[in-house]
């Protein structure tokens, strides 16, 4: 199999979320010791680096046509990735704890396309069984989970069925809009007297507009100085009368 090294290096170190990552002990050869490596699982590719800060992977394992199983080895929490074939290599790995080993075994077992085909096949069988239920009408969906067949892997959780949609709420009637806008007079709307526009009591008519008054006397056309003098004389006369009334006992 020919692979593009630059594309694999970019895919191994990109910012996309990973399926699993952590330190594992990898056995180098038939009689070699274990080396601590940083492993990253993306899809069906298992990359391993010198450490977590490395920018280029040391190698990659394509998880197709393989099985993941527990093995007895010098290291505790060991498991192996075995490929079919007489000359196929077996990768022996070891985790740092029991929980880490179980997590890696589960993630690696679900990484291949064979597992996805199995899941799709089981779901298709379920769908065919539901559709061809002897011509009987399907019951209404209830808010509970459907049982899965025993052959389906335990990794798939049952999907809860959705409840039936609620009944539609009747729409409220919209207010009736007038067919024409009321006329305007000098930019102001005039109250309409027709009952079609306002069914309630008739509003009071607007007050009449005041018009500019025309001059009626000689003072209306007099200049300001003359007006000031005339009104000043009246004020002085009134003030004199008021002072004289105070002086008299």
Curated annotation (Swiss-Prot):
Modified residues (Phosphoserine): 213
Highest taxon of the lineage: Eukaryota
Residue span of motif F&H: 223-235
GO cellular component, one term: clathrin-coated vesicle
GO molecular function, one term: protein homodimerization activity
Documented effect of changing residue 224 to A: Loss of OCRL-binding. Drastically reduces membrane targeting
Places the protein is found: Early endosome; Recycling endosome; Golgi apparatus, trans-Golgi network; Cytoplasmic vesicle, Clathrin-coated vesicle
Further comment: Was named after 'sesquipedalian', an unnecessarily long description of a simple thing.
The protein's role, per its UniProt record: Plays a role in endocytic trafficking. Required for receptor recycling from endosomes, both to the trans-Golgi network and the plasma membrane.
Protein name: Sesquipedalian-1
Native species: Homo sapiens (Human)
């Amino acid at each position: 199999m020919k692979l593009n090294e630059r594309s694999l290096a970019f895919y191994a170190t990109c910012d996309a979320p990973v399926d699993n990552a952590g330190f594992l002990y990898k056995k180098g050869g038939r009689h070699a010791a274990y080396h601590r490596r940083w492993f990253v699982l993306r899809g069906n590719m298992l990359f391993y680096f010198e450490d977590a800060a490395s920018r280029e992977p040391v190698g990659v394992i394509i998880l197709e046509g393989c099985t993941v199983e527990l093995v007895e080895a010098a290291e505790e929490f060991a498991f192996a990735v075995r490929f079919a074939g007489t000359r196929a290599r077996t990768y022996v790995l070891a985790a740092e704890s029991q929980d880490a080993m179980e997590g890696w075994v589960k993630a690696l077992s679900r990484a291949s396309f064979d597992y996805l085909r199995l899941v799709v096949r089981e779901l298709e069988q379920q769908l065919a069984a539901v559709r061809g239920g002897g011509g009987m009408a399907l019951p209404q969906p209830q808010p509970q989970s459907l049982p899965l067949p025993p052959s389906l892997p335990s990794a798939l959780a049952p999907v809860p069925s959705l409840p039936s949609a609620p009944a539609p709420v009747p729409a409220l009637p919209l207010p009736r809009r007038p067919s024409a806008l009321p006329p305007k007079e000098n930019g102001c709307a005039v109250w309409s007297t027709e009952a079609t526009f306002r069914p309630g009591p008739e509003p009071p008519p607007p007050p009449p507009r005041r018009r500019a008054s025309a001059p009626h006397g000689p003072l209306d056309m007099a200049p300001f100085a003359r007006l000031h003098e005339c009104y000043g004389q009246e004020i002085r006369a009134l003030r004199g009368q008021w002072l004289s009334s105070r002086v008299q006992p």
